[in-house]
């Protein structure tokens, strides 16, 4: 088994460290990793220290425990030469799909990407795969339906047909079939011919319905990538046909303007935890964030996703278990999936979790009532209702004066220990988001890194050497990825940036200790710091893309007195 776990580009090192922690926690042997732009590949096929039965636990543990993985794909077979459609068709015939396709006649979704290859027409490639599925794969997986699952119904039918023949031919001593199965409906049960026929009809309908459901369950999604005339097929192991995407943690989630997905919210918090506090010139003081030693405030709360992920981390809840609906994955429909072992695995990792938040206050605020309502709804859906989780409608400056100072001094008989400073973690408005959605956009961007050749998807730039230094990527290409921020700004947004910077400048460090913002506007740093005149500056932790927009995670650093 070879797994490819995807993530937003530039967050690969975070995912790499998280997966290593997950595997260690699950007491699984660490395999060799390969890190690509946009994902990590784990090859379990040739590792002599990993048994065949143990391999499925890697898939189970990452899918249930990862906060960062956006999808998990299983490589189907080896990569193959693919210079023309003839080679493509021949190699499709050689691949063994049966393990990763449910017994369904529904055509799969197919995603195709091509790079620097003679085959570049993605629709033509997709059409040929669908044709191959209908002509070859569908028949193979259909005959593999495990009819033993329907054994109780089949035994009842066999028994009823035996009794029917006995009624219809009472003097035929050679009637056989069903003698050992009479106990199913009882030897003493007297049934008329009509009653038996009615029961047979009902059971046949039931059997057909069960088999029909088996044949019409959602099919695995297929990914075909052809890079420099080399093809590779993968199937999505986690996203179910019902559309339960791996990164989604809340069913029917209410969203506000420009939401951030759960995986990116977790990545932001993990990156902050992984960074270190700078004290003076060239010295550090340890982690910038300990969720147990600070209160959290998101002044642009949106849908409440950052608060939601922070709570989940505080409670040490598994991403797959911090939902009020049963999470299902596509691999549960695979032919060789062991349901019994998987259920035992889930029991071992999903321990009861208290929804109570102790010793930490979490505040979300926003000027938009829709955002407040969405946040309350989403956290309530997950069972998070506690006096330490608070939401307020209002401007951040008024919330700071009216709520943050007050909550910082609360002490509920020593139980909550709320005499702790607040840390701001927030996703700022940045031009194309929220505030100036009715303003005309300027078609220009501001570079924040030198221009360089973009790394191709799938190009290997880092191999695991057990070096846990944060972002120790050993490729000059990776250090110079092209990054641009939005350069458009409205008067309202400019005013917001200035007032936000003034609040930080005037704040008491015993009340507001740290500030982390996800920024996507090139003007934010200069405006919020008053062109360097305020008593703080911004330091970039990382950058990535959020919904097609380039963003940077910044941390506030106080200037020496």
Swiss-Prot record:
GO molecular function terms listed in the Swiss-Prot or TrEMBL record = tRNA (guanine) methyltransferase activity
Biological process GO terms, please? tRNA methylation
Give the superkingdom in one word.
Eukaryota
Q: Which CDD domains match?
A: THUMP_AdoMetMT
Q: Which UniProt keywords apply?
A: Coiled coil
What upregulates it?
Down-regulated by Pseudomonas aeruginosa, PAO1 strain and PA14 strain infection.
Coiled coil residues, start to end? 187-217
Q: What is a single Pfam family found in this protein's UniProt entry?
A: UPF0020
**What's the protein name?**
Putative uncharacterized protein DDB_G0293380
Lineage, top ranks: Eukaryota, Amoebozoa, Evosea, Eumycetozoa, Dictyostelia
């Amino acid at each position: 088994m070879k797994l490819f776990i995807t993530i937003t580009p530039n967050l690969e090192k975070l995912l790499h460290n998280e997966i290593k922690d997950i595997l260690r926690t699950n007491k699984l042997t660490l395999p060799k990793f390969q890190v690509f732009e946009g994902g990590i590949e784990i090859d379990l096929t040739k590792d002599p220290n990993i048994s065949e039965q143990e391999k499925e636990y890697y898939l189970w543990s990452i899918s249930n425990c990862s906060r960062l993985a956006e999808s998990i794909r299983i490589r189907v077979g080896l990569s193959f030469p693919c210079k023309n459609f003839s080679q493509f068709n021949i190699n499709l015939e050689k691949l063994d799909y049966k393990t990763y396709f449910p017994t369904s006649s529904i055509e799969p979704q197919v995603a195709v990407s091509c790079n620097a290859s003679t085959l570049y027409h993605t629709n033509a490639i997709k059409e040929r795969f669908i044709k191959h599925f209908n002509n070859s794969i569908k028949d193979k997986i259909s005959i593999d339906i495990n009819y033993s699952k329907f054994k109780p119904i089949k035994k009842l039918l066999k028994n009823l047909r035996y009794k029917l023949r006995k009624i219809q031919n009472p003097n035929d001593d050679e009637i056989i079939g069903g003698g050992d199965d009479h106990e199913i409906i009882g030897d003493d049960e007297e049934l008329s011919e009509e009653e038996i026929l009615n029961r047979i009809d009902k059971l046949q309908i039931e059997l057909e319905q069960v088999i029909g459901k088996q044949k019409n369950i959602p099919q695995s999604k297929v990914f075909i990538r052809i890079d420099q005339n080399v093809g590779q097929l993968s199937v999505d192991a986690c996203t179910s046909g019902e559309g339960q995407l791996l990164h989604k943690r809340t069913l029917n989630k209410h969203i506000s303007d420009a939401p951030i997905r759960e995986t990116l919210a977790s990545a932001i918090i993990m990156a902050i935890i992984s960074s270190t506090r700078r004290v003076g010139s060239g010295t550090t003081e340890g982690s910038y964030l300990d969720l147990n030693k600070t209160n959290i405030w998101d002044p642009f709360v949106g849908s409440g996703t950052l608060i939601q992920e922070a709570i989940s981390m505080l409670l040490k809840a598994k991403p797959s278990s911090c939902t009020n609906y049963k999470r299902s994955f596509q691999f549960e429909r695979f032919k060789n999936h062991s349901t019994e072992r998987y259920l035992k695995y889930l029991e071992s990792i999903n321990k009861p979790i208290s929804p109570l938040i102790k010793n930490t206050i979490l505040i979300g605020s926003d000027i938009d009532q829709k955002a407040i309502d969405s946040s309350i709804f989403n956290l309530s859906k997950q069972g998070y209702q506690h006096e330490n989780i608070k939401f307020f409608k209002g401007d951040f400056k008024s919330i700071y004066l009216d709520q943050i100072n007050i909550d910082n001094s609360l002490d509920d008989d020593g139980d909550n220990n709320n005499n702790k400073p607040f840390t701001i973690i927030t996703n700022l408005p940045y031009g194309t988001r929220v505030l100036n959605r009715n303003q005309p956009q300027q078609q220009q961007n501001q570079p924040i890194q030198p221009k360089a050749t973009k790394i191709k998807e799938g190009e290997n730039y880092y191999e695991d050497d057990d070096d846990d230094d944060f972002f120790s990527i050993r490729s000059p290409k990776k250090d110079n990825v092209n990054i641009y921020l939005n350069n458009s700004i409205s008067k309202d947004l400019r005013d917001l940036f200035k007032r936000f910077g003034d609040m930080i400048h005037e704040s008491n460090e015993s009340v507001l200790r740290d500030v982390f913002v996800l920024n996507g506007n090139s003007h934010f740093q200069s405006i919020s710091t008053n062109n360097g005149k305020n008593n703080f500056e911004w330091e970039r932790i990382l950058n990535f893309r959020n919904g097609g927009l380039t963003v940077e995670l910044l941390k506030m650093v106080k200037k020496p007195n």
